[in-house]
Amino acid sequence: MEEGKMDENEWGYHGEGNKSLVVAHAQRCVVLRFLKFPPNRKKTSEEIFQHLQNIVDFGKNVMKEFLGENYVHYGEVVQLPLEFVKQLCLKIQSERPESRCDKDLDTLSGYAMCLPNLTRLQTYRFAEHRPILCVEIKPKCGFIPFSSDVTHEMKHKVCRYCMHQHLKVATGKWKQISKYCPLDLYSGNKQRMHFALKSLLQEAQNNLKIFKNGELIYGCKDARSPVADWSELAHHLKPFFFPSNGLASGPHCTRAVIRELVHVITRVLLSGSDKGRAGTLSPGLGPQGPRVCEASPFSRSLRCQGKNTPERSGLPKGCLLYKTLQVQMLDLLDIEGLYPLYNRVERYLEEFPEERKTLQIDGPYDEAFYQKLLDLSTEDDGTVAFALTKVQQYRVAMTAKDCSIMIALSPCLQDASSDQRPVVPSSRSRFAFSVSVLDLDLKPYESIPHQYKLDGKIVNYYSKTVRAKDNAVMSTRFKESEDCTLVLHKV
């Protein structure tokens, strides 16, 4: 960052989550990420700097090692002129969603993270004058718990995402249950992956967004019908996938465009050869537990037809989905097995609070921290060291379960044969693409009790709902058989 030349008019609002806000530069492929805090919570500049530096270090020393340097962009901490930050804050305020304005942008420290703009291709520093499409997917957890510590039988049959959908709809978070099941996407089977991606497109919730030239064109819009959304989306995408033919508008055109998009995303997700160290986890973390979620609509529809769900074809080991799944599976014990170990660490810290720094709970996230994560033993020797390792592995696994994958696509130019970037074909065109991961902040140690309570809540609600539905079905069948009258006619 060239501090003396910062102009707030060159930056625009890009988006925000619960803990940070992002602005993007108009010409350069960079974004600034600022922390957000409730109005009454004051942090010193040093604390904010350390918080941001920890995020950078964790990305650089841990997630880059697991996922590969081509996928992980950890950025750097920068110090900005306070006047620039204040003016920027005023400029973007009107663009912020009302639901996010309960927290304020940090305008006092001057610190932010500078990162590449992942809605652009990750090969050029400046925005190219060609159209760019970016699909952001939050794939969620791709396996069913295999730990013997799991006490709820349902957790061995139905994935966390599918169970959580029922609770989210009941509490009004979403209007309807999504047909998406992460196990279908992570299966490596193209038929199941296509179904998963179409389901995400039908009910995006906050798990799918599409950007065109850096601008959000498709995401969670509760008030609008999926049909209207799809036709509008197809209008945006048609020039990418059918650049020169006169494909008419209407349902046929919409279906053709969506099909092309789904096929291209699938090919990109199955591609890749970036070297990460996640392979070091695979001997202990092979595919365990069921490979199919009983609640997946894809699996249910096949069962109704008397067919078996296609097994996972297996993800290529170089692809990002495979590596992400490996890191997710560092959750070796499930939250049920992990929570007693968290309590062991807590008791130790109550007795020796000064040890918190030595245990690296709040960092530093360095090579030593990373090396301890590679211990995949599940034999509890009763020590604090064992408990701490499992707690840290769980935090890293939860981070991988909540990360987002960014796929940037740009139509290849006629003279692009010398281009060094990877290319994916569609029916009528070819795309240069890049794949990146974001949302890689380490999950807080303090959130573990909340995760334990939430897990129980999700499973109990799902079990109750499913039991009620099953009882209703059985009751209807019994009633039908009761009401049935056999009439014999003389012949």
UniProtKB/Swiss-Prot annotation:
Sites bearing Phosphoserine, chain numbering: S282
Superkingdom per UniProt: Eukaryota
Tissue: Ubiquitously expressed, with high expression in heart, brain, testis and placenta.
Listed GO biological process terms: inositol phosphate biosynthetic process; inositol phosphate metabolic process; positive regulation of transcription of nucleolar large rRNA by RNA polymerase I
UniProt main location, coarse: cytoplasm
Compartments reported by the entry: Cytoplasm; Nucleus
InterPro entries recorded: Ins_P5_2-kin, IP5_2-K_N_lobe
Motif, EXKPK motif: chain positions: 136-140
EC class of the enzyme, as a word: transferase
Molecular function GO labels: ATP binding; inositol-1,3,4,5,6-pentakisphosphate 2-kinase activity; molecular adaptor activity
A GO CC term attached to the entry: cytosol
Entry keyword set: ATP-binding, Cytoplasm, Kinase, Nucleotide-binding, Nucleus, Phosphoprotein, Transferase
Catalytic activity annotation: 1D-myo-inositol 1,3,4,5,6-pentakisphosphate + ATP = 1D-myo-inositol hexakisphosphate + ADP + H(+)
EC number: 2.7.1.158
Note on domains (UniProt): The EXKPK motif is conserved in inositol-pentakisphosphate 2-kinases of both family 1 and 2.
PANTHER family: INOSITOL POLYPHOSPHATE KINASE 1 (PTHR14456), INOSITOL-PENTAKISPHOSPHATE 2-KINASE (PTHR14456:SF2)
Role played: Phosphorylates Ins(1,3,4,5,6)P5 at position 2 to form Ins(1,2,3,4,5,6)P6 (InsP6 or phytate). InsP6 is involved in many processes such as mRNA export, non-homologous end-joining, endocytosis, ion channel regulation. It also protects cells from TNF-alpha-induced apoptosis.
Similarity field: Belongs to the IPK1 type 2 family.
UniProt protein name: Inositol-pentakisphosphate 2-kinase
Origin organism lineage: Eukaryota, Metazoa, Chordata, Craniata, Vertebrata
Gene from which the chain derives: IPPK
